[in-house]
């Protein structure tokens, strides 16, 4: 994991998947040593109940394992979005997320994006139906921006940090196994 800065407050984006679960676990493990006073929040945008259920499991599991940290709130929101207003889900998520962040004066989000390791054949199969996603996957297989600042329409500026962008999915799974947190493998949605 990339070295994390010291934050007064940080919001971890929990998708209900293994990448964000591993990220929260890594953050908790590191903060137990270095940043015990940092207020830790989480947020989950969901379209299906199983996403929220998995994210809540992750939040509870990691919070119980590292109970001495300054845990705050796990926010959630229905991430339905109007395609005529937002061109893609990411933009809608920035707007939804920023509302909670402004209310709690949070300026930093940790996001669990990892490198993509799909084969060329797998990418070609997806290209016709998901051209925008495939072009993003191709870009992310080489370089992922590890820090990016956003200014949503409500003008609450914040920065997204991607501290595990140098990991692949298999590296994330190995990390979870090495730390005997196998419940995160069975209770997440990816």
Regions found by a protein language model. Give the residues of each.
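Nucleotide-activated chemistry modules centered on ATP-dependent adenylation/adenylyltransferase
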Residues: 1-190
